[in-house]
Design a protein with these regions (language model features):
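N-terminal amphipathic, basic-rich helices that act as targeting or association modules
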Residues: 2-84
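AMP-dependent adenylate-forming
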Residues: 33-38, 74, 99-128, 284-288
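Conserved AMP-binding/adenylate-forming core of the ANL superfamily
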Residues: 43-48, 97, 111-166, 183-188
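A short N-terminal helical cap/helix-turn-helix that marks the beginning
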Residues: 50, 58-72, 90-112
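Short beta-strand segments
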Residues: 50, 153, 278-281
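Residue-level detector of well-ordered alpha-helical segments, enriched
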Residues: 52-60, 160, 164, 273
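Surface-exposed helix-capping loop/turn segments at secondary-structure junctions
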Residues: 62-72, 142-148, 228-231
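Structural core segment of the AMP-binding/adenylate-forming
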Residues: 170-295
Length: 295
């Protein structure tokens, strides 16, 4: 190997695109045509982008071909303040998963999934990813998941978890995730707030060259969620019984602690409940034997 090739890349220019052939050049020329302006350099484009914020970001939207079911009535309010944060692309409606999956060619590699072990590295094409996401989204719909429902994950950054996330986005549900190194109390603190109807997880986690059982923490998490839901159900029933037997008590209506308790119970009565747990088994090689696990 030549000496130059063995030198670290940090601080060295490894490639320079030809002048006039960069994607940014084509974008700048497009803005010049569509807005009848003269922007000869990148610096000119930057100045225009901060003086014509709405026009610039509309041009970016068009350039990257965002797919939307409803277009924005306004990109951003003129002279929008830094605080409170401005609302962007007002009225636009789009699906994140659709935009992620649409643009890649079928045979292009969409995901390179790696673990600590090189032999576990796998590549997934856009065609394969679309198929997996479609199947997972169909399964979520069959489980009754609708836009606005919450789907959670208690797993690692795996291909299966990515597919679950994109499927969740495809059906319009809310996604939240917790890293597998979280203990039960930390997971419960998060999930009792967001109330998932479906929980994705795994049976094992590979860390520092060893496989660690994950089912123990998962089962404890499920038990904790169900216990909280059972208590809330009992509270709701007790509240409903008291509400039915009580007369219209003006004192109760003006009693702030009672009003807060009543509001909490009414929220609990309508909150979503954990209904399904989906486990994606660890599919890498065993560190000890290089053999795939059964099941």
């Amino acid at each position: 190997m030549a000496a130059a090739e063995s030198e670290p890349l940090q601080g060295r220019v490894v490639w320079t695109p030809p002048e006039g052939k960069k994607r940014m050049d084509a974008f700048r020329e497009r803005i010049c045509r569509e807005h009848d302006v003269q922007l000869s350099t990148y610096e000119d484009l930057h100045k225009w982008s901060v003086s014509e914020v709405g026009k610039f970001w509309r041009a970016v939207w068009d350039e990257i071909n965002v797919i939307a079911s409803a277009d924005a009535a306004q990109v951003i309010m003129d002279q929008a303040p830094m605080f409170p944060p401005a609302e962007w692309f007002v009225g636009a409606r789009l699906n994140f998963a659709e935009n992620i999956l649409h643009h890649g060619q079928d045979d292009d590699v969409a995901v390179i999934a790696c673990t600590e072990r090189a032999q576990d590295t796998c590549r997934t094409t856009y065609a394969e990813l679309r198929k997996q996401v479609t199947q997972a989204a169909r399964a979520l719909r069959k489980l009754g998941i609708v836009p606005g429902d919450t789907v959670a994950s208690y797993s690692g950054n795996t291909l299966e978890n990515l597919v679950a996330f994109l499927a969740c986005s495809a059906v319009g549900a809310v996604w939240t995730s917790v890293a597998p190194d979280f203990g039960t109390s930390g997971v419960l603190e998060r999930l009792t707030t967001v109330r998932p109807r479906v929980l994705f997880s795994t049976n094992q986690v590979l860390y520092n060259g060893k496989l660690h059982d994950h089912l123990g923490k998962l089962n404890a998490t499920i038990d904790g969620l169900l216990a909280i839901q059972e208590k809330e159900q009992k509270d709701k029933q007790a509240y409903e019984a008291k509400k039915a037997s009580d007369s219209q008590d003006t004192q109760e209506a003006t009693d702030e602690p009672q009003a807060k308790k009543r509001a909490r119970l009414e929220v609990a009565a309508t909150a979503s409940r954990l209904e399904h747990v989906i486990i994606a088994p660890y599919m890498g090689t065993h560190p000890e034997s290089d053999a795939r696990p059964n099941g």
